[in-house]
From Swiss-Prot:
Subunit comment: Homodimer.
NCBIfam families for this protein: DNA_YbaB_EbfC
UniProt-recorded name of the protein: Nucleoid-associated protein HPP12_0031
Location of this chain's protein in the cell: Cytoplasm, Nucleoid
InterPro entries documented for this protein: YbaB-like_sf, YbaB/EbfC
Keywords per UniProt: Cytoplasm, DNA-binding
GO CC term (a single one): bacterial nucleoid
Native species: Helicobacter pylori (strain P12)
Function: Binds to DNA and alters its conformation. May be involved in regulation of gene expression, nucleoid organization and DNA protection.
Residues annotated as signal peptide: none
Domain of life of the native organism: Bacteria
Amino acid sequence: MDFSQLGGLLDGMKKEFSQLEEKNKDTIHTSKSGGGMVSVSFNGMGELVDLQIDDSLLEDKEAMQIYLMSALNDGYKAVEENRKNLAFNMLGNFAKL
């Protein structure tokens, strides 16, 4: 492969990455804790887009904090795992070229 082809490949990768990022924005990852008493949803960019807390937790601050931390951590992990998968898929597509 010569260097003129490499530029075209890189441009193609940039375009594919932009398309994946745009699609990823619409992906929603939801995590729950406390048997569903706390639910958080993140978009693919890692932005918190929804938070639900059962009314019964409003009287128990400590439990709410624990459930909230658990749900948030699980949500962040799901977003990161999705990002890794997208990156590996993109690299796999590049290797095929």
